[in-house]
Amino acid sequence: MEHQKTTPHATGSTRQNGAPAVSDRQSLTVGSEGPIVLHDTHLLETHQHFNRMNIPERRPHAKGSGAFGEFEVTEDVSKYTKALVFQPGTKTETLLRFSTVAGELGSPDTWRDVRGFALRFYTEEGNYDLVGNNTPIFFLRDPMKFTHFIRSQKRLPDSGLRDATMQWDFWTNNPESAHQVTYLMGPRGLPRTWREMNGYGSHTYLWVNAQGEKHWVKYHFISQQGVHNLSNDEATKIAGENADFHRQDLFESIAKGDHPKWDLYIQAIPYEEGKTYRFNPFDLTKTISQKDYPRIKVGTLTLNRNPENHFAQIESAAFSPSNTVPGIGLSPDRMLLGRAFAYHDAQLYRVGAHVNQLPVNRPKNAVHNYAFEGQMWYDHTGDRSTYVPNSNGDSWSDETGPVDDGWEADGTLTREAQALRADDDDFGQAGTLVREVFSDQERDDFVETVAGALKGVRQDVQARAFEYWKNVDATIGQRIEDEVKRHEGDGIPGVEAGGEARM
């Protein structure tokens, strides 16, 4: 998405109204020793703009950066979706923003944390946003808990400090978090660079083909650079030397022509099979076995262009899972449905009602709707009708009947957990990750990392954490408890001053 550059002014600067500015170095005063005057308009405008030049940082995912690129479809997946962006041979401009979840602007890139992987496709049918992470799962499956979760990873209201007790209190009171916390405390919680990590859509989405056939789909972006991670000591050292390590690595790699690539694969579950699969496919804390549904290659994502203006093209980029296109829909995943509202609403607050008019957020195709005016709205509506139906020749949409990207649902309005499937539980997949995926060395490092993160945690929460990990794996849980008790009072890796886990 091209950014409009400001033309250099050969004869000096101007005021905001375009008139010449007399000086950018000297204020207007009454004599050389006198006070400045209120009608020094250029001085006042300069400070007024400076006071308003920032927009609120994202509540989660505040620290990040990104780049533009291209997605090329190399395989034929038209049997799964009619979306033009995924038709054979299609090339689509993209924007990918990486981030950490918990850290604020200015926090180190190499803190242990989940990494955001927010991808926009500028398609012929509109912007398609896939707002994912570098993990295939998440801590929660109900959006009612989301705001509480984010607060538990932020700062205490009195001291303004982050607090390991608060983090573990939330996790252990919500056992569905176990799979993601295991992933986080494992080797992939500290990616060496953004280029050397995978990305995932995490949620389950609905794909619909030209014949109306439906599949539930999971996205996997597999790094062609391989997956490489940092040790606790390496991450701590880099955090103290260069808080922007990941941002710098990405920018400099692209600048010298080393363009990172990811291959996109999907898992496709036939619509009806989603109703009876042994895990609930709409539970964000679970993965879908690749033995049951192997990955299918779609194409390759390449990042090849750095932003020209970080604020205008990265900080002002407004992603939302609600931005879908024909052939791609949402699913009964509660977290996905909650995010579809919350993310767009957050962008309206953070950037403004005109958010979709900014160049980085504008779709490539023409927009025709009945949204008019509002704060900072600058589209000219002229004599267009502002209402429908109308008799003035302005078109509108009026389709009725079932929607392509819908699903069946019935029942009484209720507040309760999702129905359990045959193999559903909160600790099983986390245990499999520890026992069958981690190497012996990775298990040893995992025990050390978790024990370090539990250092200084209040004893009742610590005791609950020991049981939490024993539910994941009895042996690992006991090793964690033994390690914490053995090192009580000592400094151990993985803990910042004050007992804060490196998150």
Swiss-Prot record:
Stored CDD domains: catalase_clade_3 (cd08156)
Residue ranges, compositional bias (Polar residues): 7-17
Region (Disordered): 1-27
Cofactor(s) demanded: heme; NADPH
SMART domains per UniProt: Catalase
Any GO CC annotation of this UniProt entry: cytoplasm
Annotated residues for binding of heme: 343
Ubl conjugation in keyword set: no
Compartmental location: Cytoplasm
Enzyme Commission (EC) number: 1.11.1.6
GO biological process: hydrogen peroxide catabolic process; response to hydrogen peroxide
Catalytic class of the enzyme: oxidoreductase
Primary site of residence: cytoplasm
The reaction(s) this protein catalyses: 2 H2O2 = O2 + 2 H2O
Keyword tags: Cytoplasm, Heme, Hydrogen peroxide, Iron, Metal-binding, NADP, Oxidoreductase, Peroxidase
Active site, renumbered: 61, 133
SUPFAM superfamilies: Heme-dependent catalase-like
Family that this chain belongs to: Belongs to the catalase family.
Subunit structure of this chain's protein: Homotetramer.
Purpose of the protein: Decomposes hydrogen peroxide into water and oxygen; serves to protect cells from the toxic effects of hydrogen peroxide.
Annotated protein name in UniProt: Catalase
Organism this protein belongs to: Micrococcus luteus
The gene coding this protein: katA
